[in-house]
Amino acid sequence: MTRVPRGYIARRRRTKMRSFASNFRGAHLRLNRMITQQVKRAFVSSHRDRGRQKRDFRRLWITRINAATRIYKVFDSYSKLIHNLYKKKLILNRKMLAQVAVSNPNNLYTISNKIKIIN
């Protein structure tokens, strides 16, 4: 049988996959089958880790706020601070509170005083 030259479609698909794998090492960079497997694996990991990143950052913010409230004796605990914020309808998310707690603890103290005064 004579050899049938393939069209450009398969080559275009492979070069597209190869462009995704440009930073891989070894066979994961050179062999087409390995490239497709590893690129699929990388997409799965990136999709999973986008959700995980949100959880991790939320945990980090909560830890920072909790540490700051205990160190600067703003409240007894993080949960009491958040409870009073919701009770007084002060709209501050955890990211903003963590930023305040890390960069300028005096502002965290004034926020807590506002909560206590409203009580």
Swiss-Prot record:
Q: Name one GO molecular function term.
A: rRNA binding
Q: Where in the cell is it found?
A: Plastid, Chloroplast
Q: Name one GO biological process term.
A: ribosomal large subunit assembly
- Keywords tagged on the record: Chloroplast, Plastid, Ribonucleoprotein, Ribosomal protein, RNA-binding, rRNA-binding
Q: Which Gene3D superfamilies match?
A: 6.10.160.10, Ribosomal protein L20 (1.10.1900.20)
GO terms under cellular component:
chloroplast; ribonucleoprotein complex; ribosome
Q: Which is an annotated Pfam family here?
A: Ribosomal_L20
NCBIfam families the record matches? rplT_bact
State the protein's purpose. Answer: Binds directly to 23S ribosomal RNA and is necessary for the in vitro assembly process of the 50S ribosomal subunit. It is not involved in the protein synthesizing functions of that subunit.
Family named by the database record: Belongs to the bacterial ribosomal protein bL20 family.
Protein name in UniProt = Large ribosomal subunit protein bL20c
Report the source organism. Answer: Agrostis stolonifera (Creeping bentgrass)
